[in-house]
Amino acid sequence: LHSDLSHLTKYTCNDMVVDKDGHAYVGNFGTTKHNIDVVPTCLIHVAPDGVASIAADKLEFPNGAVITPDGKKLIVGETYAGRLTSFDINSDKTLSNRKIWAQMMPTWIFYITKIRRFLKQVAKESGYAVRVPDGICLDEAMGIWVASPTTFEVFRIEEGGLVTDIVSTPQRAY
């Protein structure tokens, strides 16, 4: 699968998930290395023939993503919003019915991160450990394992936000 995505985003692309039919959903940073401001950005759909389009917009650094085994739901980690957001996958592979699947970051922290790019700086200054999603993995019980680089852990979270398991890591978890 090859596709030029530069007409859809000017930011560096990052994690991607591919469904059983070969359709890819690709996230991006929503910022550049030289830009302090973080802006909402998009999740890009790439069809097997390479045709790309915007699948969802106004996401805060769409990062790790999973597709449920039935192929009907996509869940993406929004790193800068500290949440997992779900979408229904329609038969034409478009996304609809956006919902917050689990909120990890308190709203007040989210507004601070709109001003400051690095969440670790917020945590350092506030003394508050801010969980954010990076890479994610869906388990057989429909829980999501989340790598959180800001808290040096991988944790399991259920829909609605209940954290059921935590594994501390000696280094940042991505």
Per-range role (PLM):
Residues 6-24, 40-42, 55-73, 104-144, ...:
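Beta-rich, blade/repeat-based domains predominating
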Residues 48-51, 81, 91, 151, ...:
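Short coil turn/linker residues within repeat-based beta-strand modules
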Residues 1-4, 53-57, 95-105, 165-168:
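Beta-propeller fold detector
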Residues 27:
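Residue-level hotspots at or immediately adjacent to binding/recognition sites across diverse folds
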Residues 30-41, 79-82, 149-150:
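Short, solvent-exposed loop/turn segments at conserved positions within beta-propeller repeat blades
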Residues 45, 86-88, 154-156:
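Conserved blade-register residue in beta-propeller folds
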Residues 148-174:
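C-terminal closing repeat unit and adjoining cap/tail of repeat-based domains
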Residues 87-95:
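Short loop/turn segments immediately following beta-strands, especially the blade-tip
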